Amino acid sequence: MRYWSIRDEDVIDLVKRRYNVTISADQIAKARGFEFRISWKKAIETARAIRFLTIKQAEDYMEKVKDLKAPIPIKEFTRKQAHHNVPWDGWPVAKWPVKVADSFLQVLRNLESNASYRGLNIDNTVIVHASASRGMRIRNYMPRALGRATPWFQDTVNIELVAVELPAELVPKKFSWARVLKAIK
């Protein structure tokens, strides 16, 4: 059995500390995606970038990343990474992970469906928890000369998103790069 990395009580406590609002377990929607064949490092950075956005803002952002119109800021895995001209100030390391954005879009659409099924207002639903963890390792071997073989393993990634319906005055109205950079710092 697979367990969530965050419990409902922890989500309620997180919302209480961040937004100073008391919510119930009925205002929480969750979605998971298992074993996507994507980069684990890029998935962590993408999860960090979409946290504290609404579901619609996160979907629009992932669509822009897929179309190579908006980059994902890279915070942790910056060694030997290119520095680009980016639409924000003071953070030059960025990437355009298309496969990761496509995988996150699948989970975001599932989260939107789960939230509407639970009766939550999609416009007021904010992602409060986004995580990417390593999944199963797919073992492959590349045949070499003289009967040898080289391991050619492939890692997979599990994606987990939790969203909460907040009061309308606490919901971010529009997408801003400053909020994305503040969330990843």
UniProtKB/Swiss-Prot annotation:
Keywords assigned by UniProt, alphabetized: Ribonucleoprotein, Ribosomal protein, RNA-binding, rRNA-binding
Pfam families on file: Ribosomal_L22
Superkingdom field: Archaea
GO biological process: cytoplasmic translation
Assigned protein family: Belongs to the universal ribosomal protein uL22 family.
HAMAP family, sorted: Ribosomal_uL22_A
Role this protein plays: This protein binds specifically to 23S rRNA. It makes multiple contacts with different domains of the 23S rRNA in the assembled 50S subunit and ribosome.
Protein name: Large ribosomal subunit protein uL22
Organism: Caldivirga maquilingensis (strain ATCC 700844 / DSM 13496 / JCM 10307 / IC-167)
Gene coding for it: rpl22
